[in-house]
Amino acid sequence: MSTIENFDAHTPMMQQYLKLKAQHPEILLFYRMGDFYELFYDDAKRASQLLDISLTKRGASAGEPIPMAGIPYHAVENYLAKLVNQGESVAICEQIGDPATSKGPVERKVVRIVTPGTISDEALLQERQDNLLAAIWQDSKGFGYATLDISSGRFRLSEPADRETMAAELQRTNPAELLYAEDFAEMSLIEGRRGLRRRPLWEFEIDTARQQLNLQFGTRDLVGFGVENAPRGLCAAGCLLQYAKDTQRTTLPHIRSITMERQQDSIIMDAATRRNLEITQNLAGGAENTLASVLDCTVTPMGSRMLKRWLHMPVRDTRVLLERQQTIGALQDFTAELQPVLRQVGDLERILARLALRTARPRDLARMRHAFQQLPELRAQLENVDSAPVQALREKMGEFAELRDLLERAIIDTPPVLVRDGGVIASGYNEELDEWRALADGATDYLERLEVRERERTGLDTLKVGFNAVHGYYIQISRGQSHLAPINYMRRQTLKNAERYIIPELKEYEDKVLTSKGKALALEKQLYEELFDLLLPHLEALQQSASALAELDVLVNLAERAYTLNYTCPTFIDKPGIRITEGRHPVVEQVLNEPFIANPLNLSPQRRMLIITGPNMGGKSTYMRQTALIALMAYIGSYVPAQKVEIGPIDRIFTRVGAADDLASGRSTFMVEMTETANILHNATEYSLVLMDEIGRGTSTYDGLSLAWACAENLANKIKALTLFATHYFELTQLPEKMEGVANVHLDALEHGDTIAFMHSVQDGAASKSYGLAVAALAGVPKEVIKRARQKLRELESISPNAAATQVDGTQMSLLSVPEETSPAVEALENLDPDSLTPRQALEWIYRLKSLV
């Protein structure tokens, strides 16, 4: 904002603007003036750049021209969407006074603040993604983290113990807006994130947080929510709730509870694992060819969002998982009937949030009515499903016959977008409204009669009666006949080819009609607000219904996917281990144009590490990732792509697969690789599933091999995690001979002339060849380069059978094996004392050593 020294020098309107802007200095202020939202000074300059709109000037105030930009009020949603997507927040200032009775500027106030994390408008949200507001707090004992989805009322908190866990939570939740304390120490953790908001320390005070939360939930303490002993999480939650209330400028009745998310309740995946497994986002940042893209054929947006939450938080409670499995099995015969009906339910969850915020639009209520109309048919279909969990969902979804009847009587079939447009409340719902409408709607008949009468009376055949929003009712006569207008016709408007007049009788009728229209619209708005009052007492039951419908959508979807994609129900076992028969990669098998080669896997305490060798493009990474994805799918309760699966307890999934430079943090590829490896070695347990791909390739051969060997030893002997260890260091294939619990498997290929065929089939034992030059040729490396490489390979192999790491056989020398017998020359040198030699003796020793070499 430009500094204005003399406040009194401004016009009254600009004084009002400056007072409001001073209350919201950090964000854009949309200041309502008639049919436009105006922005002034620095706000105008910023908005013109962000929105690509014209920057103009509005006269002068305090002797200086005022930069100004404006947007039409009817198009505000489009502009808000653009700003929110760029991480901006906007204060919406409306006229609340009556211009007709106002002395000086019309009274205005900020009615809501639109921020990236607190939006609930349908036009601003991505319907199949959660939109989270989050707050982060840190003290000497760790982090506190809270998230709120204001569009559903879902409120969660957690207490990540360390930086890695906090980073994983940030990646999992991906908040649209993140609040942090002004003294937050770990800025490198959040730098570069969208929607960062620095907040004062007092907003994170624990006593204030407890008071805020108890007030919100109507409780005396927080014991019932299981969060009483989570002080760091509560500090974050208190700040977050206060911010939500400040921005919405209303109560938040749909936020009725808070849930503690504990690490031990779900399978932990760090940020690298979520990225590498491409659960909901591929490595390029898109949604194509991800696990969610294959599994998500849900028919409601709220079901899609729930499925993605399941995928990012696999549960460890086998009772929950067995219940989901049983439900999926029971629903498989009913998917074709249930999905078309569920599709009609729509996004009831977000509609209810807008109802709670009293921002629901007429079409929201029409959609709610349509959702209620599906419930009897859904309940009838589910009655035939022999499953206790399904029947529990059926009860939770309710029927709401009274509310359905209310909305059928109150709202017309296809209402307009906004209640201010009128025509929302159905005829017959309110007698007084019908009377005012009859008076207003009778205008058409009256005008037709008046036009016929005046034409006959004046004899003017061009005379017609009309209406426009600016000038009201008028009698129009062509320019050629205007000189014949009767004396009682008073000119109202001159056009190029016509004149428009008013007569006392028409003016009287206009006042009467406009009064009736105004009163009808005012009454309609009042009745619309009263509908909120009738619906809101049922909010808790309605939210339970929406949650049950979303869960039903997810389970019906997983049943359909299991049947369509030939998935099988996995079996949970008590001991650590994974046994897969004919396993397939859920994503790769969908994008291949040829049959996917299924492969087995056997991991157990006695066979806890597989050393995987084979050519590049042979399928090692696919084999590893498919194992992790099958485990992940099993732990959301889904069926899995395999013939048979037995899976034991898993506490964490780690992946060290691929790497790139992290230039923003100044970390090389190798540094990124080692950081991820360190995280695995510090945090993995015997119940963890670990994928290690090409450890050590970012440094010299000897360094890399040494690190890979030591990491493999540590994982197999000390941690005893279930590990898939892919490598091109063929020396590692000797590990099974040196330690218990390690086995070799490989993926083979066949060479024929200059071509290579990858078999993609996993076999026991180590690979016999790396096929690196064949893959290079396949990639299009020039023939002369390949030819030279073959020559160099033969040279290296003649020097050391191990130098090229191409052939593996019984005679291969390990880089890490004991050295051969020391040469005579070296032995002679070791026994020699140079200080005791005479010059002649030294010369003789040189000749003698020469003969020994």
From Swiss-Prot:
Coiled coil: none annotated. This is DNA mismatch repair protein MutS. Gene3D superfamilies: 1.10.1420.10, 6.10.140.430, DNA repair protein MutS, domain I (3.40.1170.10), MutS, connector domain (3.30.420.110), P-loop containing nucleotide triphosphate hydrolases (3.40.50.300). Pfam families: MutS_I, MutS_II, MutS_III, MutS_IV, MutS_V. The keyword DNA damage applies. NCBIfam families: mutS1 (TIGR01070), PRK05399.1 (NF003810). GO terms for biological process: mismatch repair. GO terms for cellular component: cytosol. Belongs to the DNA mismatch repair MutS family. It comes from the Bacteria. This protein is involved in the repair of mismatches in DNA. It is possible that it carries out the mismatch recognition step. This protein has a weak ATPase activity. Keywords: ATP-binding, DNA damage, DNA repair, DNA-binding, Nucleotide-binding. SMART domains: MUTSac, MUTSd. SUPFAM superfamilies: DNA repair protein MutS, domain I (SSF55271), DNA repair protein MutS, domain II (SSF53150), DNA repair protein MutS, domain III (SSF48334), P-loop containing nucleoside triphosphate hydrolases (SSF52540). GO terms for molecular function: ATP binding; ATP-dependent DNA damage sensor activity; damaged DNA binding; mismatched DNA binding. Transmembrane segments: none annotated. The keyword Endoplasmic reticulum does not apply.
